[in-house]
Amino acid sequence: MKFLVVFALLLATTYASPVLYQRDLVVPVLDDSLEGRITNGETASAGQFPYQVGLSLKLSTFSSAWCGGSLIGNQWVLTAAHCTDGVKSVTVYLGATVRTSAEATYTVSSSDIIIHADWDSSTLKNDISLIKIPSVTYSSKIQAVELPAVASSYSTYAGESAIASGWGKISDSATSVTSNLQYATLSIITNTVCARTYGTSIVTSSNICVSTTGGVSTCNGDSGGPLVLASSGVQIGLTSFGASAGCAKGYPAAFTRLTSYLDWIQTNTGISY
């Protein structure tokens, strides 16, 4: 049986020399018939994704990492737990299309971060966190994304199209995140299909997966970024993990399923639909 490493899609660098690392989990790949090729996403236009957030995460004095996130309220950013776990501070970029050219920028400390109490870094379960920021003024380039209604909690979304966005690597050969915001339209697959690749111990009801036909996929540096329904713009997931064999190899990409955490989000932010 072939083994593959599943990784959280976070890109980290040190100031001395850029280095890519990920938090690894070795799992059996049950379906090894997939193939893929590198196909970049599309470049976003200014204001196309006004809820997109960029996060520069200070890990230590000499190292930092990049993740994505989404603005869900005028004081709240939603992202992945594996992005914020152990960070010293976070610089939040709002309203940007070019990665660090933002309409508004805030730096907050670790005390402004709420990580899910049951986050498990060894299995990537409950990979979700919140960042509280100073109140932001909405504009054409800064808007909150809509979250799923509680009534839709049991929807699988299988077969629907969704849009993922972020500044992550645009190819497996890239060594750093991209400057310009990228996006891709992806097809949601059932968890049963996704589990054929990663196994049922990894893919659970709190995940949502997409196919990466043609090698179009999320990649390192996209972690925590939004997955929204193409039909409505409602955010249903946040980028969590993929396969270490490569972003463009055709293996499914996995997200944290937001309908599993609507109560948690409401408890901590007061936001609900």
PLM regions and their residue ranges:
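C-terminal subregion of chymotrypsin/trypsin-like serine protease catalytic domains
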Residues: 2-19, 53, 66-84, 91, ...
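Chymotrypsin/trypsin-fold serine protease catalytic domain
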Residues: 22-27, 89, 106, 128-135, ...
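Active-site loop architecture of trypsin-fold serine endopeptidases
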Residues: 61-62, 120-122, 154, 167-184, ...
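A conserved glycine-rich beta-strand in the N-terminal activation segment of trypsin-fold
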Residues: 48-52, 56-74, 123-124
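Conserved H-D interstitial segment of serine endopeptidase catalytic domains
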Residues: 31-32, 55-58, 77-80, 84-121, ...
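Extracellular/luminal ectodomains of metazoan preproproteins built from arrays
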Residues: 14-47, 139, 146, 153-160, ...
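Acidic glycine-/aspartate-rich tracts in secreted/extracellular proteins
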Residues: 58-60, 82-86, 95-100, 133-140, ...
